[in-house]
């Protein structure tokens, strides 16, 4: 990872010509928050294209926010500005950041919500935003998304150099997403990271963690979630019988436990944080 003056000026140039700002929050859509943020952005940069990635991140759940932005950001054009506000520490001493990679800018609180970006991007520059003249005044301690993050994103869209906002930092908050671990010689233990809108259980298990599940001849295995033992991997949701629970490789790159036209979470009575055990060989066949 490169920190400091390492991001080419081409990103700044493309932002100025074609400003796209994405929004990822846990604010929901029942209140005025999102509309107000868009109003602030457009008042500063009327040419901004504002794209909603997601406003249904689980409330206060920084890991869910990190997963959400990590799945979406790379599909946007070079120069896109991603505002990510999942901010249970709003109004405290936690820092507002601008993080720049070779292709994108991120505006977010320094609470780890960009942790998966830090893992994936090799060249990054992070800055603590201290230039209060870029803020909407007076700053509310309960709505930094309106008063700090939105105007900062808008000024970036206008082409203001990230260096103008504050000093470079290297001690930003980051965490590692939970990784599967060997429970014993025959069992790999993962966890449900999130439950999507359809009730699919998205685990933290990748094909690299469990190649035996996704090869042409997977051998004997079972996936244990709650009280249910699952012994099939399907290639598409519709290949399961209605209500059948099975494993599938999801578009996020993780093993999912899913049900055809049903909610695996409801059928199994489990949710985020539930253990997912993959048992192999004779240990799987013996029960």
Report each predicted region and the residues it spans.
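N-terminal glycine-/serine-/threonine-rich phosphate-binding loop
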Residues: 2, 6, 14-93
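Active-site histidine-anchored catalytic micro-motif
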Residues: 19, 44-50, 64-67, 75-79, ...
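Structural motif
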Residues: 19-22, 48-51, 80-83, 96-98, ...
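Conserved active-site and cofactor/substrate-binding residues in soluble primary-metabolism enzymes
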Residues: 32, 36, 45, 60, ...
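Anionic-ligand-binding alpha/beta catalytic cores of soluble enzymes and soluble regulatory domains
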Residues: 136-214
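A conserved acidic, glycine/proline-rich C-terminal tail/linker
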Residues: 204-269
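Short, charged beta-turn/beta-strand-edge "cap" motif at the junction between a beta-strand
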Residues: 252, 282-285
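Surface-exposed interaction regions enriched in Ser/Thr/Asp/Glu
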Residues: 274-281
């Amino acid at each position: 990872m490169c920190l400091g003056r390492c991001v080419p000026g081409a990103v700044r140039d493309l932002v100025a010509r074609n400003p796209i700002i994405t929004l990822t929050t846990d604010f929901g859509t029942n209140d005025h928050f999102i509309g107000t943020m868009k109003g602030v952005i457009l008042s500063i940069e009327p040419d901004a294209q504002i794209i909603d990635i997601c406003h249904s991140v689980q409330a206060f759940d920084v890991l869910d926010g990190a997963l959400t932005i990590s799945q979406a950001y790379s599909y946007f054009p070079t120069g896109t500005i991603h505002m990510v506000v999942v901010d249970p520490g709003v109004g405290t001493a936690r820092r507002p950041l601008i993080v720049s990679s070779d292709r994108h800018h991120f505006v977010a609180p320094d609470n780890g919500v960009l942790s998966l970006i830090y893992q994936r991007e090799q060249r990054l520059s992070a800055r603590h935003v201290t230039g209060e003249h870029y803020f909407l005044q007076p700053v509310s301690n309960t709505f930094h998304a309106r008063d700090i993050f939105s105007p900062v994103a808008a000024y970036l869209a206008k082409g203001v150099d990230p260096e103008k906002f504050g000093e470079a930092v290297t001690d930003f908050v980051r965490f590692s997403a939970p990784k599967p671990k060997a429970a014993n010689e025959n069992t790999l233990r993962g966890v449900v990271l999130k439950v999507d809108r359809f009730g699919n259980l998205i685990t933290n298990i990748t094909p690299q963690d469990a190649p035996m599940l996704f090869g042409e001849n997977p051998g004997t295995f079972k996936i244990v979630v709650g009280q249910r033992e699952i012994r099939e991997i399907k290639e598409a949701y519709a290949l399961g019988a209605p209500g059948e629970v099975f494993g599938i490789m999801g578009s996020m790159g993780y093993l999912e436990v899913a049900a055809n036209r049903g909610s695996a979470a409801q059928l199994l009575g489990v949710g985020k944080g539930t253990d997912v055990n993959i048992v192999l060989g004779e240990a799987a066949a013996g029960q």
